[in-house]
C-alpha cells in the first residue's frame, strides 16, 4: 500500500513539472511565430539588381569604346573581292575638305586611278540650233590589254567597263564638283569658239585708198 502511494506521489509530481514547463515552451514557439510574421520579407531592390549588370558591362572585354575620331587601323577584308576590297580606313565625314565617295561607295578601285575629261561637245555641221549646251565627262582610253578588233569582220570590243560611257552636266562647275567628290583626276577642255566677221554686199562699193580688190568680202 505504501509503495502504491509513493508511485502515485511521483506521478503527480511529474505531471506538475510538465504542466509548469508547457507554457514556457508554448510561449517561445508563439513568440517565434509572431516575430517571423511581423518581420517583412526582404525583396531585392532594383538598384541592387542593376549594379551587377553595370559592372558586367564595364568589365566586359566586348564593350565597344566610344571614338570621337575615325579609326584608321581597320584591316582590309580581302575576302570581299580581289578587285574591290574594303578600304584601309573608313572616314565618317569629320575630316576637312571633300570626302571621296569612292572610299565607301563600293565602286571598283580601278576607277580611282582613271583620268576624266570635262568638255563641251562641238555642234555638228548638220545642226544649226544651240542644243549642245550640256557639258560632258568621259574616261580616258586604256592603252593595253583592254581592246581587241576582229581582223576579218572589223568588230571591236573592249574589257574596259567605262569605255563609251559618259555623263552630262548642266554646267562646268557641276562636272568639276562631281569629279572631286568621286576622287577622279580631271582636266577641263575649253570649247573653241568660232568668231564670224559680218559681211555685206555693200562693202564692195566703199571707198578704199589702197589698191582695189575684186572681192572685198573675203
From Swiss-Prot:
Keywords: Electron transport, Membrane, Mitochondrion, Mitochondrion inner membrane, Respiratory chain, Transit peptide, Transport
InterPro entries, per database record: NADH_UbQ_FeS_4_mit-like (IPR006885), NDUFS4-like_sf (IPR038532)
Pfam families: NDUS4
Domain of life: Eukaryota
Region listing for Disordered, in residue ranges: 31-74
Principal cellular location given in the protein's record: mitochondrion
Transit peptide: 1-33
Record has Cell membrane as a keyword: no
Keyword Membrane on entry: yes
One GO BP: electron transport chain
Amino acid composition bias (Basic and acidic residues), ranges on this chain: 50-60
One annotated Gene Ontology cellular component of this protein: mitochondrial inner membrane
Subunit record text: Complex I is composed of about 40 different subunits. This is a component of the iron-sulfur (IP) fragment of the enzyme.
Task of the protein: Accessory subunit of the mitochondrial membrane respiratory chain NADH dehydrogenase (Complex I), that is believed not to be involved in catalysis. Complex I functions in the transfer of electrons from NADH to the respiratory chain. The immediate electron acceptor for the enzyme is believed to be ubiquinone.
Family statement drawn from the similarity comment of this UniProt entry: Belongs to the complex I NDUFS4 subunit family.
The protein, known as: NADH-ubiquinone oxidoreductase 21 kDa subunit, mitochondrial
Organism: Neurospora crassa (strain ATCC 24698 / 74-OR23-1A / CBS 708.71 / DSM 1257 / FGSC 987)
Amino acid at each position: 500500500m505504501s509503495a502504491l502511494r509513493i508511485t502515485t506521489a511521483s506521478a503527480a509530481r511529474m505531471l506538475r513539472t510538465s504542466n509548469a514547463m508547457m507554457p514556457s515552451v508554448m510561449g517561445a514557439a508563439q513568440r517565434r511565430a509572431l516575430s517571423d510574421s511581423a518581420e517583412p520579407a526582404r525583396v531585392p531592390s532594383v538598384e541592387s539588381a542593376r549594379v551587377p549588370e553595370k559592372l558586367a558591362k564595364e568589365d566586359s572585354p566586348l564593350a565597344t569604346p566610344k571614338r570621337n575620331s575615325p579609326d584608321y587601323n581597320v584591316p582590309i577584308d580581302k575576302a570581299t573581292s580581289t578587285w574591290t576590297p574594303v578600304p584601309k580606313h573608313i572616314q565618317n565625314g569629320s575630316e576637312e575638305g571633300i570626302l571621296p565617295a569612292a572610299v565607301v561607295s563600293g565602286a571598283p578601285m580601278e576607277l580611282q586611278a582613271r583620268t576624266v575629261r570635262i568638255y563641251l561637245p562641238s555642234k555638228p555641221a548638220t545642226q544649226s540650233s544651240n542644243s549642245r549646251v550640256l557639258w560632258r565627262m568621259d574616261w580616258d582610253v586604256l592603252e593595253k590589254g583592254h581592246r581587241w578588233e576582229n581582223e576579218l569582220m572589223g568588230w571591236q570590243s573592249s574589257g574596259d567597263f567605262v569605255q563609251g560611257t559618259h555623263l552630262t552636266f548642266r554646267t562646268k562647275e557641276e562636272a568639276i564638283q562631281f569629279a572631286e567628290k568621286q576622287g577622279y583626276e580631271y582636266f577641263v577642255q575649253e570649247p573653241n569658239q568660232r568668231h564670224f566677221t559680218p559681211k555685206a554686199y555693200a562693202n564692195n562699193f566703199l571707198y578704199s585708198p589702197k589698191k582695189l580688190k575684186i572681192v572685198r568680202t573675203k
